[in-house]
Each structure stands twice: as C-alpha cells, then as structure tokens.
Amino acid sequence: MEQFEMIADNAENIYQLIHAESGRRLDPFDIVLQFKIKNRTEYVSADVDVKATAEDIASSGKSPNITSYARIRSEYVNDPDYIFIVLSLKHKVFSERFPETGMTNGVMEVVSYSVYDLKYISERDLSYNPALGTGQLQIRDIHYVDIVNRTAWEFCQMLDAKFIRSRGEDAWLKMATKYQWIKTD
C-alpha cells in the first residue's frame, strides 16, 4: 500500500496514479487505485486483489479464491469498463526462533510478482467453484496464467457458461433475475 501511496503523492508519476486507498474489511479487493485519464479531467478506478504465495510451498498459489461470481458479473454489467486486478506476490520467509523465549522473528521478501486483469485471464485458467454462496471464481495456478483479449460482454458470457455447466440454466435465470442482469425495457 505504501508503494502505491508514494507513487500517487508524486504528481509527475508516469502512471497518472492520483490516489490509492485500502479496501474495507468485506470488500472483494484489498486496494483501490485511481488514475487520471491522460489529457482529461476524468479518472478511472481499478480494484486490486492481492494474493500472497510462498515460494517454498509447492501447492501455494493453486486455486486461490478471487471473488464471487455474482459480485464480479454485476460489476461488469453496471460498468463494462470496470477494472479488477489480481496482484500475485510470491514471497520467501526468513526467520529465526529464539530458544530462550520461544519467539520467532521473521522477514518476508517478495521474490517475484505478476499482475493480471481478471477480464483477460484465459478461460482455461479461470475456474468456477460452486461452493460459498453464488460460487467463487478461482485461478487454477496463479503463477502460470495465459491472457486472452476480450470484451466485458465476452467475459460475462464465459462466466455464465461456467456457472450454467455447474448449476444449470434455471439457477442462472433465477440469479439473473435477482441481480437484474436481464434488461426488460
């Protein structure tokens, strides 16, 4: 968070980042970034979900929960330009234990990172898990992700197909009605 704040505080930053803040406790993201649109007075926001994985644990980064199906689909219906970023931080832990106190002193070092726009994660790498409410989107392996350019509409169609394969078309219609995804005007 501090790194984003330092960049935003520099009015000359090359990213046009103007503001960074932490998400609230139950938000599906950890950080909100606001960028100025070049040569305009408008800005665009990006929600960032931070996923930390351990370098020395083989299963770390396998199928992390990203966000709920209904929540993310609703965001893209309301704003096709919505940006949801997954920031993957791979870390290594250095620690020592003090035998006299039993306390451990440790430091985490970020050894690599990857950044993905959720909308562009390939269909093969993004899975739907029906557990937990409306279901969770998961990345199969956060360290190896392919990117596919697509529109918000194509992204929603892919998510819907995954949901329907898992729960059926009747369940999708019920949810689409509840969240007002189907426009009747």
Predicted features along the sequence, with ranges:
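Nucleic-acid endonuclease domains
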Residues: 1-27, 35-46, 52-185
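Ligand/cofactor pocket segment of small-molecule handling proteins
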Residues: 31
